[in-house]
Amino acid sequence: VVPEDFEGYCRVRSATKIAVAGGECEYTAFGFKRYIERGCIDIAQPDICVSGGLTEFQRIAAVAGVYGTAVIPHVWGSGVAIAAALAAIAAMPLFPHTANPVPFQNEPMMEYDRNPNPLRDELLVENFELKDRKVKVPDKEGLGIDIDDKVLEKYRVL
C-alpha cells in the first residue's frame, strides 16, 4: 500500500488480525494523526532521521499515545539513525496499550535492519551490537556515538 492511500491501509487492517505498522514516509505529528484517526495503523513508525528529529518524534508519540497507538521507530540507515532511535525509545514511557502480543508487551522496540549497509557497519567508531534481541543504549553525551572521520570522508559527496 502506498503511504498516501489511507483507505488501502484501512482495508489491510480490517482484513487481518496482524497489527499494521506504517508512517515511515510521514514527517509530522499532523500526518500521523491522520493515519491514526482514520484507523489506518496499529503501530506508528516514524523515521526519526526524516521526520523532524527527536522533537517531532516526541510529538508523534504524544499524539499516538492519546489514541492508544503504539510507536516503534522505523530505522533504516546509518549508525546515527540507530543511535537516534535508541535515544528516543529510552526516553519513552512504557506503553501499556500496545497491540503487540506478549512477550513484547510494554517493551520499547525499534526496527533493526540487518541487511549489509556500510553506513551502519562502518561509520561509527564503535558499532552497535544486537544481542538477545537487545541493543545497549549508549551512555555518553549526545547520541552517545563517535563518527569515524575517515569513513565519513570516504562517503562524502561533493
Could you describe each region identified by the protein language model?
Residues 137, 149:
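Active-site and glycan-interaction determinants of carbohydrate-active enzymes
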Residues 139-141:
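C-terminal hydrophobic helical "lid"/dimerization subdomain
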Residues 152-153:
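Intrinsic disorder at enzyme termini
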